[in-house]
């Protein structure tokens, strides 16, 4: 079975509402382009960023340059939780984030972080692109946020500096970084690991200084964030 983490694109609902009005005004008054901020947590080489840049290009093209989206990678606008809060405050317009922090805003989102929830990639797409996924996205409206779509982040793999991980018991005693997510914490405790919540921006240094032993992420993040420089073992747990 597979563990799949799917990413989540969200934007403030009120910004989308104002945007339609502003575009009509802009068309008649020739005002400057509307500039929106889009933030995410990973490196500029990651598919998140490449997709966000392409998205900004398409928006500019289809609005005839009336709307411009500036993309901020690598937690420039804060960690993922900070950026979601920024949506509510109106300081950020769009965010691409993992599902990890979202249960703190909409509790039903914790369901997608359960281990072994999906049989395979096709199953995940069918669920999240269907009525269940739409219901999860719509739940954010009550928080002043508009859920737009799910993006794929990949399968979760574990890296560590202690020993090869070949079976669940091998996780016993390993201090592994997780997000501040009660499902993640409970899952790793059940395997005997010692989960340690930590902001993503602190993980590389924490691994380097041996404050933690391990972390888990899809291969793209492990590669583009250069986690291999500070980790010895990779377990394809996804």
Where do the language-model regions lie?
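Short, low-complexity disordered leader/linker segments with a strong preference
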Residues: 1-35
């Amino acid at each position: 079975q597979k563990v799949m983490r799917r990413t989540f694109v969200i934007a403030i609902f009120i910004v989308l509402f104002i945007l339609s009005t502003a575009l009509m005004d802009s068309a008649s008054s020739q005002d400057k382009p509307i500039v929106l901020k889009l933030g995410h947590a990973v490196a500029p080489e990651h598919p998140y960023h490449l997709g966000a840049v392409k998205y900004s290009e398409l928006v500019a093209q289809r609005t005839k340059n009336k709307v411009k989206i500036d993309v901020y990678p690598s937690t420039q606008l804060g960690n993922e939780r900070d950026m979601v809060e920024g949506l509510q405050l109106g300081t950020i317009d769009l965010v691409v984030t993992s599902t990890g922090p979202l249960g703190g805003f909409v509790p039903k989102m914790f369901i997608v972080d359960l281990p072994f929830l999906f049989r395979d990639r096709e199953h995940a797409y069918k669920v999240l692109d269907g009525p269940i996924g739409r219901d999860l996205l719509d739940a954010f409206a009550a928080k002043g946020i508009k859920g737009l779509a799910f993006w794929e982040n990949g399968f979760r793999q574990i890296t560590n500096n202690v020993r090869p991980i070949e079976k669940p018991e091998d996780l016993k005693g390993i201090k592994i970084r997780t997000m501040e997510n009660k499902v993640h914490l409970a899952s790793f405790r059940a395997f005997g690991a010692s989960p340690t919540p930590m902001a993503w921006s602190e993980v590389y240094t924490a691994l380097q200084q041996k404050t933690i032993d391990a972390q888990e992420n899809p291969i793209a993040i492990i590669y583009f964030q250069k986690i291999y420089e500070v980790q010895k073992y990779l377990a394809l747990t996804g």
